[in-house]
């Protein structure tokens, strides 16, 4: 079934709110260039929302013409404010978005979101700013929560130093098992 193009967010604003596309940190540090993902049945879209209104602006001269242009963009430096990141799920049938509660901390990363094999379950990876703890959360969209979806931690990876985030999370067909590359040692 084909439908007309449909706008699903209305609050995007240059250098303030980004929907469905990564901000600078997520593109450069977590290596992705897309911020939305279709559910297995294609009836929902999970997407990132970045509020970069508190991130300081950076100006860069862009050379290439007779005179350089100035490009201004949000660029957080070490210790400065990052974008506040949240995840939403848009339901194409209900034509509504719900925010996923990925924790109350504002100073955290959500380096990956991924649908499980179950169309009603979305996995969110949540990482602390020190990047030494990675929590795997799941939210169940079949619940009838009106505006916000609760997410629960089902696995945590910790390190004394640093954790690398990859795309190696695989959900198995049984709906409850998964495989992930762990950086733990001592086995």
Role assignments for model-derived ranges:
Residues 1, 5, 45, 87-89, ...:
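Hydrophobic beta-strand positions in blades of beta-propellers and related beta-sheet-rich domains
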Residues 1-15, 105-112:
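A conserved hydrophobic secondary-structure block that centers on an alpha-helix together
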Residues 1, 34-37, 46-52, 77-81, ...:
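Beta-strand C-termini and the immediately following turn/loop, strongest in propeller blades
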Residues 5-36, 44-99, 145:
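Predominantly five- to eight-bladed beta-propeller fold
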Residues 32-34, 83, 109-111, 132, ...:
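Beta-rich catalytic cores
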Residues 91-128, 142:
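Long hydrophobic segments that form regular secondary structure
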Residues 15-32, 104-110, 159-166:
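Short glycine-/Asp-/Thr-/Trp-enriched loop segments that recur within the blades
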Residues 9-12, 100-104, 155-159:
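Short loop/turn motifs that cap or connect beta-strands within the blades
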